[in-house]
Amino acid sequence: VTAETDVLVVGGGPVGLLLGALLARAGVDVQVWERRSSVPRGSRAIGIHPPSLDAFAAIGADAPVLAEATRVREGVARSRGRTLGTLSFARASATHPYVVTLDQHRTEAILRERLEAAAPDALRPGVALTGLLRRGSTVEATGTGPGGEPVSVRAAFVVGADGARSTVRDLLGIRTTGRDYPDLYVMGDFADPEPGGLTGTALVDVGPAGVVESFPLPGGRRRYVALSGPDRSLGAPAWRPEEAPDQEAARALAAAVRDRTGADADPETCTMLSGFQVRRREAERMGVGRVVLIGDAAHEISPIGGQGMNLGWLDAAELAPLLAGAVRRGEAGPWPGFARRRTTAARRAARQAEANMALGRPLGSLAHRGREAFLRTALALPTSDLLARVYAMRWS
């Protein structure tokens, strides 16, 4: 027997969980299919920007996130041991004058709890989508359950929040365009070696050997992200949340951090390590009829700048009331205004991420001095408040 629901969300990661909770709070009957049976582990994406915290407030997730997260109130740019300038988030948002960091598995756990509170049976772990059939005013989705059994549901709308390798997008036949970048980065979480006064400060060192960014984390930890450089000397350690980090790779990252910034990160304290290459992808359409794509399924951008997950949350926050209204009124999509606004936001975020990458690439001596002068000027101008709003995603 095929079950029925108002909205099927495919993908129970951070974006799908928020959308499911928003819909449930609006009185919409929702199912969230997540192919993974187990709860994901690891810190992964850590940055949560002010507009996302505002969206979390609608489901009561802001308070528990803030109770666990670390508030980042400023960013400091450095080079060759000297401070180039400071970017304060004090006026970046009226509600949350900071960016916060929290391990992704904890953010997901909080969102999962809020979905469970609003719709106890909505999340279906271990269910993988295999087919979509659009029939007039409904979409029939088929899949396999945790034991391989067939599963099906008939929904008024289906939302693909299933990531960069979206099954929903593939089933719709929607192609992506984009490019791969040569930049290779390695990130790792260590016991924070920075002075105690920097526990609320993000640090960006744009020295001649390549950028090192770092962000404070709860529990006295700090995330370091380093450009591997033209020789890719830091390698590309694989993401293995179930295993201890590779010690040789952890030592290589710690050595790069020490050489470029002077901070003495202890490789023995490394709890997460992963390499990643940057790519940008955009779906040619954000959906077909009653099927909509959001998050990485619709637009994948560079992780540098920490905007990708937040973009998906803001997609969800804008889509939820559209879906709730359409369900109540018996209307159908698509919503070209939604697609246009979210595509514009994704392109802006992608350009910003590309600018961030460009500022962190190795340069010759003369060009590097020019970059330092540019950053000193940009961070000293009265317009630095506008720059802070840009980095805090107030435009999104």
Predicted regions and their residues:
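A conserved short coil-to-beta-strand element within the FAD-binding core of flavoproteins
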Residues: 125-139
